[in-house]
Amino acid sequence: MDYKNLVAERIKENTELEVDLIEKLIEIPPKKEMGDYAFPCFQLAKTFRKAPNLIAEELKEKINKEGFEKVVTVGPYLNFFVDKTILIKDVLEKVLSEKEKYGSSKVGEGKNVVVEYSSPNIAKPFHIGHLFTTAIGNALYKILSFEGYNCIGINHLGDWGTQFGKLISAYRRWVDEEALEKDAIGELLRIYVKFHEEAEKDPELEKEARLNFKRLEDGSEEETELWNRFKDLSLKEFNKVYDMLGIKFDSLAGESFYSDKMDAVVQEIDDKGLLVDSNGAKVVMLDEYNMPPCMIKKSDGATIYATRDLAAAIYRKKTYDFHKCIYVVGTPQALHFKQVFTTLKLMGHDWADDCKHVGFGLVKLANKKLSTRNGDVVFLEDLLNQSVEETLKIINEKNPNLKNKEDVAKKLGIGAVVFTYLKNNRERDIVFDWKEILSFDGETGPYVEYSYARGKSILRKAGELTGEADYSKLSSKEEFELAKLLGGFNDAIMNAIDKLEPAMVTRYIIEVAKAFNKFYNAHGILNAEDNDVKLARVKLVEATCQVIKNALNLLGIDVVEEM
């Protein structure tokens, strides 16, 4: 039984509101003694022509209370107390029958969602800031797919632009081929930095770079061969990180993919009478939307990010006919995306309303203990490797005889980092602190993983238990609160989809782990007072482990069975 839906159905029987709307209005009371669900009656004031508190009293008398312990009013709220035995039985049976599918639905069936995320720049470091977009995008992809949406994950590589003309010049002058083979990104970064240093002394280098990029745009064989080499070397490095994170993309169509599609977009904008000359540049004026102009072409005729993003959006709509197109890009780009989406609307593409920018904050280091390859950029691969090493040290201290400890350290160490990126509101900055991230106490990945491993240990010791569980034996506050939380998994997922915020799932699973440990500390499980209680509690542990595993999988985190 879905109690939230039952509350909505009972209210619908006595009002003109639809179930979907009622479910959105239902709240969880701030204090447990106030009930399990609360319905605010403000929405009914116009229909009933009464004060909300009087409506609540009237509904309390009319409503069918079967399945509830009681229904009470608290001012303008109608509060429901569920029948605890029914709820526990329904939730645990549902979790244990649906297993890895528990929490999923078909709400997104038949709807395509494009998720653009990660998108590192070719020949540039894949640094710790990139994990924000990568982790958020991967989690949204998994969450949406879990709810039935057909997701298309796009890694919109930064593989085009005048910087490649500079890199070609730098390569021809200063590359160390041996260093390039050993550390491609490090060497490409070194020569790129050197180009900028030398260009300050010799402005002719900038002209040469522009000419190189012009040749690349025109399809010159020599420049194209170098560009492809830079791209292949970079992707080889990037894929090391994606393999560590277990991430695969459906498309690697980056900026270069749209290079032959931009002229048509510029022409379409011009045909609509939107293109305006501004000091030699071509722009779309957005004054009436309180935004600066959206630049389409620079004064030298070159296209910029906005042109490419317009071309990409139009291509994606034609190719995937998306229900939503999500851009997981840093918050500083918020204005850019507002300009792009508004320009699409002015071009007559009303589907621009289905394009959503998902912003995120910055990553800061709590201290400078993390070594860098060139003094200022922290490579993501180094960060993940260091996390695995630090985790292995902790395992060697706590449980040196653990089987497969290197594999456990890898899952725990990488999972701990990803969990940190997804723990709080995505627009908040992250302060990276090893001590906190790898702690087994508090709101961390290792704490949740430890809770799961603790549960699995109980299940291994319990062995195969026969007979049907009597869930009426789960009568304590801790047991009810844990079961009730498990029943709210789908709500957490739907909130994450509604807000495009994976932290809704992360925060939820932290609460589940806390509730599980409260239950574990308050009650004997394997040494319960009788076999009926033992069986019911073991089933509660099994359901908890299933929900934790499902939730961590949605976040792109592997579970560890033992630690």
Swiss-Prot record:
CDD domains: Anticodon_Ia_Arg (cd07956), ArgRS_core (cd00671). Keywords: Aminoacyl-tRNA synthetase, ATP-binding, Cytoplasm, Ligase, Nucleotide-binding, Protein biosynthesis. GO terms for cellular component: cytoplasm. Pfam families: Arg_tRNA_synt_N, DALR_1, tRNA-synt_1d. Its EC number is 6.1.1.19. One of its GO terms (molecular function) is ATP binding. PROSITE patterns: AA_TRNA_LIGASE_I (PS00178). It is found in: Cytoplasm. It catalyses: tRNA(Arg) + L-arginine + ATP = L-arginyl-tRNA(Arg) + AMP + diphosphate. A motif ('HIGH' region) lies at residues 120-130. It is an enzyme of class 6 (ligase). It comes from the Bacteria. GO terms for biological process: arginyl-tRNA aminoacylation. Belongs to the class-I aminoacyl-tRNA synthetase family. NCBIfam families: argS (TIGR00456). Monomer. This is Arginine--tRNA ligase. It comes from Clostridium botulinum (strain Okra / Type B1).
